[in-house]
Every structure is written in structure tokens, then in C-alpha cells.
Amino acid sequence: ALDEKSCGGHFFMKQHSVPKFLDNFLTRTLSGTVFSWREILHLTFPNVLDCLSIMFISMLITALISSNGEASVAAVSLVTPLAWMITCIFNGISAGGTVVVAQSCGMKDPVRIRKAAGMTLWLTVAVGTVVCLPLLMFPRQVLTLLYPEAEAVVLEKARIYLSGRAWSILVFTIYTANFGILRGLGESGRCLALSVIINAAYLVFSILFLNVLRMDILGSVFALLLARFIGTAASLILLFFWKAPVKMTFGQIFTGDKGILRSTLQVSIPLGLEQVCSSLGNVVAEMYMISLGTTALATHAIANSVIGVWYSPAMAAANLSVTVVGRCFGAEKYDEAKRYGVRCDQIALILVLLTSALFIPLLPALLGQYHPTPEVLAMAKKLLYW
């Protein structure tokens, strides 16, 4: 029999009393045979906090980097979409694994859960390593090919940042796979804990290397590497050792199953291609933007980091849908899967409206954290308001 703990049961909400009219409304809109409304909300809140913390700390890191000048911000802006495009490839594999793990939970099949978790881990790491090799071996050539018009100082800083970020990606593949497995199991509490650990470490190390030691772009590289090492170690502990939701031996990680592999790739390939195409568009935008100068690149980077926080709660609803819909499919509750997909879209829309109402009045204060020149501040405001 499948232990409730194996699919995140021990993180479900306690039965706190709520007004009857609210309980009736939430039961009609969010409850089903697979999930109660309490379970849906308990999956939603950690996801929102997870995405919000990631984007907020990313915004703070960009603000710290901006204190070293526009060239540093521009260098990070050039590398970020390229690194994200590579990340999207193995992130697609991890997302496919999340769906298969969630389906296995819905089937209440512990053997399949272990097989799906193991395959998600080794496949994500293998694909991530392969696609990262060009960045590790030829960072300068890749940047020169994509951004031939970049200023020399920006290009050199971008080379340092790309090399360091490529090494961090190798470590990050393990974290991404483990995070996807935990999300598929419904372990939202552990996912939130991992996000807090890796992002808090990134922020602390960034303050140390950028503000205290004044190491400029190299400090950002060291901060990212150390944070991802710590996050990866924590993900391994939370998945396999500390009250392990999946009990596996080392050898079981590398077991193969054609059916599970096929199911994983059926989700991973279209999802990965969609994300890669989106990221490729950002790379192309940077290629055209480079001719506008370093100031334009810095403005774009600052505006992007702010808008990432703005939309992060809505992104959480998309993450929620992967677990919820996947679990319903595994339980063969296809009508509920469709209904929960619509509900996740509605939750995303509500969150976008709420964050818009909150963030628009706060934009001047948020932009002030970047120490921008008056020109950059004016351009960033215009971009964000439009």
C-alpha cells in the first residue's frame, strides 16, 4: 500500500474551522475526489511563496550588481537569457518527471514512484550536462558570435559570468531534478524550504562578495556557485535522507523503464521546446538591443528583474497545475483534471490582478533600489508602465 506520506500527505492543512459559507464556496469550486480545497490551498501558498522569494531575491541581486556599474548589469543581461535557454532544456525533463511522479502518486503505486523519481534524476542530469558543454568549452566564442557589437568591457565581464554560470548549471541539474520530484510528490513544504535555502544563501553570498569584498562580476559567480552547491546538498537530504518521502537505493536511481521514459519525454519535449523558443526570443532581443548601447541593456535588465517579481505569484499557479492535473490523470479522474486546469488559470488571473494593484504604486521605490542614473530610471519606468 502507498503510504500517505509518499505523496505529501503529512503537509496537508490542519482542519481549522472556517465560516460555513466560505467552506461551502471553496468545496464547490476547489474540492473533488482527488483533492479537498484545503489540500489545494496548502499546495498553492508554498508555491506562491516559492516563486515570489525566487524573483524577489533575483531582483535584490540585480540591485547589488548594479552598484558596480552599468557594464556589470549589461553583462549579466547578455548572459541570463542564454543560460536560461540551456536551463529550460533540462527543466523540461524535470517538469516531465514531475508529471509522471504525480501520476504515479495518483495510481498509488510506490514501485512506479521510485522508478519515475530515479529516471527523472539521472535523465535531467545527463541532458543538462550535454547541453551545457558548449558554454563550458567555448564561452568567449559563443558570446562573440551572438553579440559581436558588444563593448569590450561588457564582453569580458559577460565571459567571466557565463563561464561561472555554466559550471553552476552542472550542479543545478541535480537540484532541479530533486525539486521536480518533490513537487510531483506534493511536497510543497519541502520545495519551499529548498527555495528559501538556496535563495537566502545566494543573497548572503552576494552581499558578502559584491558589497563587502567588492569583487564585481566575479563575486556574483562565486555567490551563485556556493548557493547552488548548498541548495543541491539540501535537496538530496530532503529527498533521500531526512524523513525521506521516497525510499530508494543508489542502484535504483539508474533503473530504466521504457514506459516511464516515454511518458516523461511526451511531456518534456513539447514543454522544453516551448520554453526554449521563448528564451531564444529573449536572446534575439538582446542581440538587437546591443546596438542601442550599455545603458539600454542595463535598463532592460533592471525592468526585467522587477517584472519577474510582479508576475511570480501567477507563475506559481502554473507550477501548481503540474502537480494537481498530473495527480488527477494518475487517478484516472480526467474530468477533474480539466476542471482543476481551468481553476489554476483563474487563480493565476486573480493573482496577476492583485499583484498589479500592489506593485504599480511601489514601482518608484523598487526602482530606487538599483542606484540607477536618471536616464536609466526614466527608461525603466516607461518600460514597466507600458
Question: What is the predicted function of each stretch?
Answer:
Residues 55-74, 143-152, 208-215, 276-309, ...:
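Helix-terminus/linker motif at the lipid-water interface of multi-pass membrane proteins
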Residues 38-98, 102, 266-291:
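Signature of the first transmembrane helix
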Residues 8-43, 221-224, 235-278:
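Interhelical loop/hinge segments that connect adjacent transmembrane helices in multipass membrane
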Residues 150-175, 374-386:
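Alpha-helical transmembrane segments of multi-pass membrane proteins
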Residues 44, 77-80, 124, 162-165, ...:
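Residue-level recognition of transmembrane alpha-helices
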Residues 189, 199-233, 365, 369, ...:
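Membrane-interface helix-loop junctions in multi-pass transport and translocation proteins
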Residues 59, 63, 89, 132-140, ...:
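Membrane-embedded alpha-helical segments of multi-pass transporters/permeases
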Residues 73-133, 172-191, 299-363:
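Small-residue-rich hydrophobic transmembrane alpha-helices
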